[in-house]
Amino acid sequence: MTKPTRISLIHATPLAIAPIAKSFKRLWPQASVFNILEDSLTADLKAANGNIAALITRFSALTRYAVDSGADGVLFTCSAFGPAIDAARAGVCVPVLKPNEAMISQALELGSKIALIATFAPSIAPVTAEFEDLARQASKTIDLRSICVPEAWAALQQGDAGTHDHLIAQASAEAVDCDVICFAQFSMTSASPATQTASGRPVLTTPDSAVAKLKTLLAPHSY
């Protein structure tokens, strides 16, 4: 019997765990998934005034731990740490994905006017840099509009998913002239249906895009 593909998910907040678990259950239930949570990273990034370089050693250690635990692939679910993930995956023998790269590739296929909605402000700069980098690699010019809804993050931390979803959907009114809306964080996924209804635009979420890319890389014949 073939051993199931083993995927390590590395989180900086517990709020990302449920959305990615649901995506795996729906899109790739055959995968064997395990979680690594290091929830001091977000606070430490703030304490370092956004200095990602201060966290690179820790991201490298988390990646090594995941690979040493038998992971066939690694997915980070924390959007604010792109440069640290880039450094951590250098030389690693298995695929290591940043949370947004698959979603960004999909968005570039859907159009050039793109809205990026975030609820955690430090996510915006690294995700914007990823968009610009991938667009440059694809020789595409994009018009990227960033929208931050910090009140939604606060609501979700208090367990109020309804208010979280409503605030994000409300903010999407600023994106009705865009080709596609992208959510910057895994924790925002529950707001996708309400946002699509409110805006009338396609909405891409990081979990679904990431699972689809991992499945393509590691189990291409299972579709």
Language model features by range: what are they?
Residues 1-223:
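Non-catalytic structural scaffold of enzyme domains
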